[in-house]
Amino acid sequence: QYELVIPQKRLSKTSDDRRWRAEVYRRLDLHGELWYAELEDKRTKNVVRHELTEKYTSVSLVDFYKKAAWEGDRFVLRDRLDRETFSLPYP
C-alpha cells in the first residue's frame, strides 16, 4: 500500500514559553490527502494528535495551510490570504 507522510517544516512552531511544540504533517495515500497536527508537551513528552481535515480529499490543501503561529495560548494556521483556517488551544 502506498503511503507518504510529509512533515510541513514551515508550519511547525514552538510556543513562546518553549513548553509546547506543534508539528504539522501532510499524508498522501491511495485515498487522497489528509492533514494532521501533533502537539507535544516538551516537559512530559506527551504527544496529542489532532486531525486538520475530517476526511480524505483529492484537492491539494497546501495553500489552505500556508502560515502558522502561536497567538497567546492558541496554535493558529492561516491560508495564503491570512484567514484563520484552524486553531488549537493548549491541551
Predicted regions and their residues:
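Structural core positions within WD40/WD-like beta-propeller blades
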Residues: W20-E23, V76
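Solvent-exposed strand-loop boundary residues in beta-sheet-rich modules
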Residues: R43-K45, L81
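Structural motif
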Residues: L30-E38, R83-L88
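Structural signature of eukaryotic scaffold interfaces centered on beta-propeller domains
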Residues: L4-R18, F64-E71
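Acidic, small-residue rich beta-repeat scaffolds with periodic aromatic anchors
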Residues: S58-P91
